[in-house]
């Protein structure tokens, strides 16, 4: 999909909206010039949050599209959230707009805005027993660290203590808690905007039993939730305790993933401690991962939920909105903003800028340089609808839009599982490269010269090869399911056959003993006969000697 967008179409289809916006703009301008600043305006501690000027322009243009389509609720009017969605669709406005619309629809249908108040996950202790996972501390850059011990996952018992729907609800609830509490707390502690996490996956002991059909169905659902509604939130991932076979499989799996994604994933063996300590302080790393933390007073590291969000002072500042940050472009890194706290949107005084930079007083739409928009197609909006590059970002408790567990991780583990159970993958399948992550567009290369100055091309895989792999995996999975479904006790008919075989063996053993006894008796009798024959021979020799002696005496008259 080309990055070119004809913004004039939106204006032609919505003349009433545009005129309404212009009237609102005039009224708002008058009110702002006549009224004094609200007494609620106060200076807060500013956190530097520099961004590329081109990204600010693209986000602003996307914001205008959302406003025209009436798809920008106040709580989602957040720069970082819109930028993540744009990156997820490679800055394709049309696809990003569709993704954003689907996200709003999903949040309304799922009830994501109220899940923290409405949902209670009573079986959390049992779930963590069969699926050890959770946050523990932050890395050296202030990002929260999420840990999963996949080798200890028992998906069968997990589905016995909860249901798939309830676990998905719990998953979304943890997302919302992270966005509303954890990332704002990390931002205050690090004095910069935090909206990504560091993930550690311990795969020691991972086998087929950890990824049966129930586990894969759960991963698929979580992947869809993450990829569609919480994109671009993984900073880095460490897969530790990976054996030689796992690393070999990873080299194959990498060909299925976007290089941008694989650059975030580090597969390590059992000597991972030094690498983790480069990223995470020992005091923030659990002892079983090479750190010094035990969390003995909180039931262990996997149950402690350690992090700055447990600090009362930081949470007080989060509740007061102190995690609001200033947004400055790299082109203009000067000027200090005043943040207005109140029910209405923030009223700010933008610093004086060069005429080449967009200003909120100039009713122009900031367009990406790659867009070929004729001059006649440009239109004006109210200054409330324009993001000035120097304008401070509005961050509330809902502004930390980043998940605990991204769709990238779910996809990687799903592909690893597929490769583990399918030994005979076609050769050309392993040699191909495909962008399989749900947060990217199609396989056509897209021009991002204004953003990165590079082009990335992809190669597709044939549907026949993919279906062959999936069919093979389904067959093997069915065999494993059938074997797992067999009872632990022996069926009655087989038990009878076994008892008959044992009885027959006992009978044969008795016959063998009798035969052995008969052989022993025969051997004894044979020995007796041999002794009797020897005695007869000796007696015969004696008689013959006596006869010879008698005849000799008789003949010679002795």
Curated annotation (Swiss-Prot):
Q: According to Swiss-Prot or TrEMBL, what is its membrane topology? A: Peripheral membrane protein
Tell me which stretches of the chain form a coiled coil: 464-529
Instruction: State whether keyword Iron-sulfur applies.
Output: no
Q: Does the keyword Iron-sulfur apply?
A: no
Species of the source: Arabidopsis thaliana (Mouse-ear cress)
Gene Ontology, cellular component aspect? Golgi membrane; plasma membrane
Any one GO BP annotation for this protein: protein transport
- Where the record annotates domain CRAL-TRIO, the positions are 123-297
Q: Which gene encodes it?
A: SFH10
Keywords (A to Z) from UniProt: Cell membrane, Coiled coil, Golgi apparatus, Membrane, Protein transport, Transport
Q: Which domain of life is it from?
A: Eukaryota
Q: Where in the cell is it found?
A: Golgi apparatus membrane; Cell membrane
> Which family does this protein fall into?
Belongs to the SFH family.
Role according to the record: Required for transport of secretory proteins from the Golgi complex. Catalyzes the transfer of phosphatidylinositol and phosphatidylcholine between membranes in vitro.
**What is the protein's given name?**
Phosphatidylinositol/phosphatidylcholine transfer protein SFH10
Matching entries from Pfam families are given as: CRAL_TRIO, CRAL_TRIO_N
């Amino acid at each position: 999909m080309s990055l070119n967008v004809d913004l004039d179409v939106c204006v032609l289809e919505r003349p009433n909206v545009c005129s309404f916006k212009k009237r609102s703009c005039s009224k708002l301008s008058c009110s702002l010039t006549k009224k004094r600043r609200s007494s609620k305006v106060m200076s807060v501690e500013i956190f530097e949050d520099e961004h590329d000027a081109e990204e600010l322009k693209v986000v602003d243009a996307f914001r205008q599209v959302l406003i025209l389509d009436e798809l920008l609720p106040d709580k989602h009017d957040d720069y970082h959230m819109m930028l993540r969605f744009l990156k997820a669709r490679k800055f394709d406005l049309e696809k990003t707009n569709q993704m954003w619309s689907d996200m709003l629809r999903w949040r309304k249908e799922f009830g994501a805005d109220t899940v923290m108040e409405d949902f209670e996950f009573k079986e959390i202790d049992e779930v963590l027993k069969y699926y050890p996972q959770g946050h523990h501390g932050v890395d050296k850059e202030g990002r929260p660290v999420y840990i999963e011990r996949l080798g200890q996952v028992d998906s069968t018992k997990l589905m016995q203590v909860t249901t798939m729907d309830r676990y998905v609800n719990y998953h979304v609830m943890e997302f919302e808690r992270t966005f509303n509490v954890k990332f704002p707390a990390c931002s205050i502690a690090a004095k910069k905007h935090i909206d990504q996490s560091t993930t550690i996956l311990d795969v020691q002991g991972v086998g087929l039993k950890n990824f049966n059909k129930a586990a894969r169905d759960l991963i698929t659902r979580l992947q869809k939730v993450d990829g569609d509604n919480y994109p671009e939130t993984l900073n880095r991932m460490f897969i530790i305790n990976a054996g030689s076979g796992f690393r070999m499989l990873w080299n194959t799996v990498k060909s299925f993933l976007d290089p941008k994604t694989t650059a975030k994933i580090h597969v390590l063996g059992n000597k991972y401690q030094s690498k983790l300590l480069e990223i995470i302080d020992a005091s923030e790393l659990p002892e079983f991962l090479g750190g010094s933390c035990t969390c003995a007073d909180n039931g262990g590291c996997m149950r402690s939920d350690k992090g700055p969000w447990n600090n009362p002072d930081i949470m007080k500042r989060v509740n007061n909105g102190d995690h609001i940050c200033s947004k400055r472009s790299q082109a203009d890194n000067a000027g200090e903003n005043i943040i207005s706290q109140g029910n209405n949107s923030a009223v700010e005084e933008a610093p004086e800028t060069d005429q080449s930079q967009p200003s909120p007083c100039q009713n122009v739409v900031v367009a990406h340089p790659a867009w070929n928009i004729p001059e006649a197609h440009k239109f004006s909006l109210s200054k409330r609808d324009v993001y000035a590059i120097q304008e401070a970002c509005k961050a509330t408790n809902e502004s930390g839009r980043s998940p605990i567990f991204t769709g990238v991780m779910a996809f990687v583990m799903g592909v690893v599982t597929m490769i583990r159970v399918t030994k005979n993958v076609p050769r050309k399948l392993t040699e191909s490269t495909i962008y399989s992550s749900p947060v990217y567009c199609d396989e056509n290369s897209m021009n991002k010269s204004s953003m990165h100055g590079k082009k990335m091309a992809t190669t597709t895989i044939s549907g026949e090869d993919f279906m062959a792999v999936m069919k093979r995996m389904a067959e093997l999975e069915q065999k494993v399911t059938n074997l797992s479904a067999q009872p632990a006790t022996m069926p009655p008919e087989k038990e009878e056959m076994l008892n008959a075989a044992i009885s027959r063996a006992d009978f044969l053993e008795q016959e063998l003993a009798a035969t052995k006894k008969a052989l022993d008796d025969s051997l004894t009798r044979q020995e007796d006969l041999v002794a009797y024959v020897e005695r007869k021979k000796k007696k015969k020799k004696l008689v013959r000697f006596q006869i010879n002696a008698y005849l000799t005496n008789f003949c010679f008259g002795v």
